[in-house]
Amino acid sequence: MKHKFLVSFLLGLTISFAGAQVIAKTPSVNNAPVARSVNQSPIQLEVIKSYQGHTLKGEAIIQIHYSQDGNYLLSTATDGLAKLWTADGELVREFAGKPVAMIFNGAFSRDGKAIITAGYNGVARIWDVQGNVLGEILGHTSAVTDVVFLSDDMGVVTSSDDGTIEGWSNIKEPLFTVTRPGVSRNMDFNAQTNLIAVTQDIGEITLLNPAGKVVRIIETDQGRLNDVDFSQDGKLLVTAGFDGTARVFNLDGQEILKIDVLDDGWVTGVAINQDNLIATVSDDGILRVWNLQGQLLGQYNPNLERLGSVSFHPNGKNLAIAAYHGTIILLELQ
């Protein structure tokens, strides 16, 4: 999550949705017709589909995440909605709490059968993909900023504006609380290393194990960290910084790469695929793809002012980006 947090709150809005069935369909992202080529760089970025995922205004927040099996894409936003899409951009279902509150982030369970959302009202809510609420977590005194599922029924972890990181069992019993300086903003979990990475707005990354033990604190000079992503093997961490850089760290905390993405503005989101290609989105509205040597391989400017989130499909060839006003764009690396 990468965010200028909002001070407003959506109150009194009631939304109901039709009970459509969730169809587990194989995504057609690999076979989708190519709309257009957007550059002539070493990596081509082909637009598959662009659509209005959410209707957002002002300093909005939008996040996108693919499911582990690659069949679905989850979008969450400060309009108070989470939306489940097929991987080729067809809407399956909308989720809204009661009362509706802005959603700062979300995540799929490892098996893709549930999602969890992080609410401005301090509530983390767990849903099945049919839209039923399975439970609510009410342990924070301020906004929930991010949420992750752990593996093998180990529970979930939440982070918050109140500076705490909290672990919860599958029956929503508290397992641990870790307090860190500042706001804990963004998280990622890697099943290979069994580690949780949590960013703080003072430029630190806290590495935890599922028992809540702090394994390492990595200090950066990026200022507020807007996003963090593990490499697939869990050996590398990529961060998006307030200072306009993306950085790559190993688990010992050593910085192995600094990418100067832009001179004036934030890097708002990062993602890394299994080939260690790094995608960045930023305040200047440009998606860029880099290698681990820091070389720019390709870029795409959708002319949407600011981009807020990026996610690689598990196949490593497709990716999705989201703009602050709610547009979602699906692309393929060529």
Curated annotation (Swiss-Prot):
UniProt keyword annotations, A-Z: Repeat, WD repeat
Swiss-Prot/TrEMBL WD repeat ranges: 56-86, 98-128, 139-169, 220-250, 262-291
InterPro entries membership: WD40/YVTN_repeat-like_dom_sf, WD40_repeat_CS, WD40_repeat_dom_sf, WD40_rpt
GO cellular component annotations of the record: outer membrane-bounded periplasmic space
UniProt keyword Repeat, yes or no: yes
Entry-linked PROSITE patterns: WD_REPEATS_1, WD_REPEATS_2, WD_REPEATS_REGION
Name recorded for this polypeptide: Uncharacterized WD repeat-containing protein slr1410
Organism encoding this protein: Synechocystis sp. (strain ATCC 27184 / PCC 6803 / Kazusa)
